[in-house]
Curated annotation (Swiss-Prot):
<dbReference type="GO" id="GO:0050566">
    <property type="term" value="F:asparaginyl-tRNA synthase (glutamine-hydrolyzing) activity"/>
</dbReference>
<comment type="function">
    <text>Allows the formation of correctly charged Asn-tRNA(Asn) or Gln-tRNA(Gln) through the transamidation of misacylated Asp-tRNA(Asn) or Glu-tRNA(Gln) in organisms which lack either or both of asparaginyl-tRNA or glutaminyl-tRNA synthetases. The reaction takes place in the presence of glutamine and ATP through an activated phospho-Asp-tRNA(Asn) or phospho-Glu-tRNA(Gln).</text>
</comment>
<comment type="similarity">
    <text>Belongs to the GatB/GatE family. GatB subfamily.</text>
</comment>
<dbReference type="InterPro" id="IPR006075">
    <property type="entry name" value="Asn/Gln-tRNA_Trfase_suB/E_cat"/>
</dbReference>
<keyword id="KW-0648">Protein biosynthesis</keyword>
<dbReference type="InterPro" id="IPR018027">
    <property type="entry name" value="Asn/Gln_amidotransferase"/>
</dbReference>
<dbReference type="InterPro" id="IPR023168">
    <property type="entry name" value="GatB_Yqey_C_2"/>
</dbReference>
<comment type="subunit">
    <text>Heterotrimer of A, B and C subunits.</text>
</comment>
<keyword id="KW-0067">ATP-binding</keyword>
<dbReference type="Pfam" id="PF02637">
    <property type="entry name" value="GatB_Yqey"/>
</dbReference>
<keyword id="KW-0436">Ligase</keyword>
<protein>
    <recommendedName>
        <fullName>Aspartyl/glutamyl-tRNA(Asn/Gln) amidotransferase subunit B</fullName>
        <ecNumber>6.3.5.-</ecNumber>
    </recommendedName>
</protein>
<dbReference type="GO" id="GO:0050567">
    <property type="term" value="F:glutaminyl-tRNA synthase (glutamine-hydrolyzing) activity"/>
</dbReference>
<dbReference type="InterPro" id="IPR017959">
    <property type="entry name" value="Asn/Gln-tRNA_amidoTrfase_suB/E"/>
</dbReference>
<dbReference type="InterPro" id="IPR003789">
    <property type="entry name" value="Asn/Gln_tRNA_amidoTrase-B-like"/>
</dbReference>
<dbReference type="InterPro" id="IPR014746">
    <property type="entry name" value="Gln_synth/guanido_kin_cat_dom"/>
</dbReference>
<dbReference type="GO" id="GO:0070681">
    <property type="term" value="P:glutaminyl-tRNAGln biosynthesis via transamidation"/>
</dbReference>
Amino acid sequence: MDYELVVGLEVHCQLNTVTKAFCGCSAQFGKAANTNVCPVCLALPGALPVLNRQVVEDAVKIGLALDCRIAPHSVLARKNYFYPDLPKGYQISQFEEPICSDGSIDVELDGVNRTIHLIRIHIEEDAGKSIHDIGDDTFIDLNRSGVPLLEIVSYPDIRSAKEASAYLQKLRQIVKYLGISDGNMEEGSLRCDANVSLRPVGATEYGTRTEIKNMNSFKNVEKAIEYEALRHREILENGGVIIQETRLWDADKGETRSMRGKEFAHDYRYFPDPDLVPVLVDEAMIERLKLELPEFPEMRARRFAADYGIPTYDAGVLTVERELADYFEETVKLSGDAKTSSNWVMGEVMRTLKEKYLDIAEFSIRPARLAGLIQLIHNKVISNTIAKQVFEVMLNDEAEPAAIVERDGLAQVSDSGALEAVAQEVIDANPKQLAEYREGKTKLMGFFVGQCMSRMKGKANPQLVNDILLKKLEG
């Protein structure tokens, strides 16, 4: 029997607010254990939560970006369960009345566009963290307790592991463009649970699902879903029954293992939190936040292609990250040369970022300096070859590119007399190649140009060298 894979994703997006969701403690990642805590985080008797307004605004922003319905009235609820890193014995979340509902995300995979519909987006707080790798004991770090999350829940519209990864990457791109999260999966800023099931092709009812947790990269999301789909298929084909449960992905072993039976909503005994008033979102807030939304990747890529005359592919690459798109656009503005700016950002800049594991925000050559280098090329002060040498110097030298060129004697030689002398020396030194060229092997022009550039240590004006050689070789 042929089966169809059915996947729905629950994504927890950690917001990059300065303070936590319900208190004034810092939400910064990486601090010493139990230093970003207060009576609210520790659930001490009498401590009362106060909702962080920024959390509400961030929820509305992503709701607008994903074309959701924004609820004018939503309720914060208590999700009751026991776990050592949950000091209150409940998690503040939303249940019957989330802040956002419906909406969708469009993804492209292998040239095919698909729309993944959303059920809801709701506000909740993160739990603390259990630490198991210190001796034989388990410790609890409550720095993360109360850090704000948005849970984004999709319908089971996803039909392949690669599509799940594409959906997650698109969602990450959107939250980063909005500036509400850094989307770092390795640090847990973006966490994904996958609900996986199989059903016979053509069937309308869903099969029994399992939930997969502990996937900390796009590749692991793909591998975990593929493994679980294969496990389901083997069970069904052997006449077995799928158990509804939560399973943990083990990346080292490349398999899932049973963690616990899958809970249902009623197991959590949700009820409105009596310590928190309902969340009210009026039209004035919505209209104000609409004006704060950025230009999203697809629209920005179309504008780059139209306004700057760069290929569609280049425009797509340059707009994958908002900061990279900003960097490129600032470089164009300062250099006045869109095509050369595109070539340099997609070439030397992105190569360096990859080699040094840097984000564009950490890159030492800011747009003004790169634009200065591009202008030196445009004004024929230096060649492209020399420009790459200058670029390498600029990585560790704060001097302006023009100052580096002057200091290191890298200016392009355009003295026709000097270049004619070098060209004649090269021709005289290579009589065999000269004869072959004049017999019709015109591709040897590259050889002669290369020899001239080598003698001039790359500083000769290549177009002028080419013109001089052509005249001499054809003479």
